[in-house]
């Protein structure tokens, strides 16, 4: 009797899995079969490939389709959007309100400070939180942060590393120095003598630098953030660890007055309380240092690989420096560095901080036919996740000829257009700190390359591999470079 019961249970389980894995096909949609538990994300679950690479494969295998059905972890049906017009409708057009929520899972009771992040917040709350931050990043406000950036650049200039160095580590030291000063009015001690004296470590580096480092734990965190809150609760995940939450609250209490972002927030009309200030400070700090550090490291790497692009950038630096008496950390001079900014945008195209955006349907709406000329619309139900594959879009040869080549000229004569470039997102939920991020990164790139050439530390070094273990893009084995002094031509 027992063998028969077990056989029936096994057969029922297999039939259920088959039925579940054919969800999209039953609705007449072209889609791969979804395997039990892992859906189409097996290599991601095993830490073999990043989630961006999985989505890129689905994107590439389905040319001619406006969208593709697929299965996330735990075989959850989802939709990957390919069509540029559909992307526009979802991000900035008539369907924005239907899927305005970002599908990122954080326990708001355990992660109180992270819950103030407008990227994470959902419902109507994200609008209120974003409205608090937007006034901090107007062009005039961003210019007011330039003294903080200039001080960090001076420290960076005084100690350009000799010999082999890891680019992301150097970039993280710099961006932490900037954001600590710009947000709190504090010195993070990440550059200067503290960089050279091993027995005087910076608390900022000790606590924040490891936060986004690849590890098995970071893979579990990425799964819980992007796929299932149940896993997050099971492993006790916090986007902002508890000791950091306590420390951020202390920093808010100890902030200095003057021209810093936190002081401007405290003086805002909404009259923010200490907990709201701590939440916004957490957002500004975590999103202000990591993504900019990643961009600076990858920009240096791409310029080391592409000598012609680096040569052209040096020519621009020399020409602009000649017009400004050698001072490039100046709002007018930085604005004239168009090729340098194009190089940063091109590095961000090749290495986006987030490899995909995920939107959760907040009300039922209808997608057009999957293929042009077909006559079968798809009703998207409440709770369905729509994936906007940033990495795949950025590497689509139909949108960018020779997409794997580093060509800053793509962005030289025109800004990124439409939804072809999603390095900062798009629409009402676009990154509000884009201007400050580009300013601090461009200033650092200028400082490092005004008197130096950058090159690979090892001539036979292969292309940098992206770690499959992290939520934000990171290198698997580091980005190892070296500097060589050059003579300015002015």
Swiss-Prot record:
InterPro entries, alphabetized: Cyt_P450, Cyt_P450_CS, Cyt_P450_E_grp-I, Cyt_P450_sf, Insect_CytP450_Detox
Keywords assigned: Endoplasmic reticulum, Heme, Iron, Membrane, Metal-binding, Microsome, Monooxygenase, Oxidoreductase
Family, per entry: Belongs to the cytochrome P450 family.
Membrane topology: Peripheral membrane protein
Keyword Endoplasmic reticulum: yes
GO molecular function: heme binding; iron ion binding; monooxygenase activity; oxidoreductase activity, acting on paired donors, with incorporation or reduction of molecular oxygen
PANTHER family per UniProt: CYTOCHROME P450, CYTOCHROME P450 308A1-RELATED
Taxonomic classification: Eukaryota, Metazoa, Ecdysozoa, Arthropoda, Hexapoda
Binding site for heme: 431
Function: May be involved in the metabolism of insect hormones and in the breakdown of synthetic insecticides.
Main location: endoplasmic reticulum
Cofactor(s) needed: heme
Family matches, as Pfam families: p450 (PF00067)
GO cellular component: endoplasmic reticulum membrane
Organism encoding this protein: Drosophila melanogaster
Protein name: Probable cytochrome P450 308a1
Ubl conjugation among keywords: no
EC number in record: 1.14.-.-
Places the protein is found: Endoplasmic reticulum membrane; Microsome membrane
């Amino acid at each position: 009797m027992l063998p028969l019961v077990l056989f029936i249970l096994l057969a029922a389980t297999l039939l259920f899995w088959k039925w579940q894995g054919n969800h999209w096909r039953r609705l007449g949609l072209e889609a791969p079969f979804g395997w039990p538990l892992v859906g189409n994300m097996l290599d991601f679950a095993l830490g073999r490939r990043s989630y961006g690479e999985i989505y890129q494969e689905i994107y590439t295998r389905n040319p001619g389709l406006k969208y593709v059905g697929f299965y996330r972890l735990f075989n959850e049906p989802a939709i990957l959007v390919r069509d540029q017009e559909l992307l526009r409708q979802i991000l900035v057009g008539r369907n924005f309100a239907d899927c305005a929520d970002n599908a990122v899972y954080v326990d708001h009771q355990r992660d109180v400070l992270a819950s103030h992040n407008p990227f994470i917040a959902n419902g109507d709350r994200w609008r209120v939180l974003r409205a608090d931050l937007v006034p901090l990043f107007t062009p005039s406000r961003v210019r007011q942060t330039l003294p903080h950036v200039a001080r960090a650049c001076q420290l960076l200039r005084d100690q350009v590393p000799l010999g082999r160095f890891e680019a992301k580590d150097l970039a993280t030291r710099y961006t932490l120095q900037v954001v600590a000063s710009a947000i709190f009015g504090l010195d993070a001690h990440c550059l200067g003598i503290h960089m050279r004296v091993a027995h005087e470590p910076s608390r900022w580096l000790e606590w924040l630098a490891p936060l986004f480092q690849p590890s098995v734990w970071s893979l579990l965190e990425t799964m819980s953030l992007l796929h299932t809150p149940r896993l997050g609760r099971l492993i006790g995940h916090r986007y902002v660890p508890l000791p950091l939450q306590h420390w951020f609250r202390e920093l808010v209490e100890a902030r200095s007055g003057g021209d810093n972002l936190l002081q401007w927030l405290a003086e805002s009309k909404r009259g923010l309380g200490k907990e709201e200030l701590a939440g916004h400070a957490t957002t500004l700090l975590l999103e202000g240092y990591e993504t900019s550090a990643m961009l600076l490291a990858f920009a240096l790497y791409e310029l080391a690989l592409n000598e012609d692009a680096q040569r052209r950038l040096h020519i621009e630096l020399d020409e602009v420096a000649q017009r400004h008496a050698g001072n490039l950390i100046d709002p007018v001079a930085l604005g004239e560095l168009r090729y340098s900014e194009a190089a940063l945008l091109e590095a961000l195209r090749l290495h986006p901080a987030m490899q995909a955006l995920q939107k959760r349907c907040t009300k039922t709406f209808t997608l057009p036919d999957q293929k042009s000329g077909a006559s079968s619309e798809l009703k998207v139900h409440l709770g369905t996740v729509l994936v906007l594959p940033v990495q795949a879009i950025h590497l689509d040869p139909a949108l960018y000829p020779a997409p794997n080549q580093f060509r800053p000229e793509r962005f030289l004569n025109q800004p990124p257009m439409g939804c072809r470039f999603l390095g900062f997102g798009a629409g009402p939920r676009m990154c509000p700190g884009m201007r400050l991020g580009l300013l601090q990164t461009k200033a650092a790139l200028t400082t490092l390359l005004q008197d130096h050439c950058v090159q690979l530390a090892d001539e036979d070094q292969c292309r940098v591999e992206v770690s499959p273990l992290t939520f934000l893009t990171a290198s698997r084995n580091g980005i190892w470079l070296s500097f060589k002094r050059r003579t300015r031509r002015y």
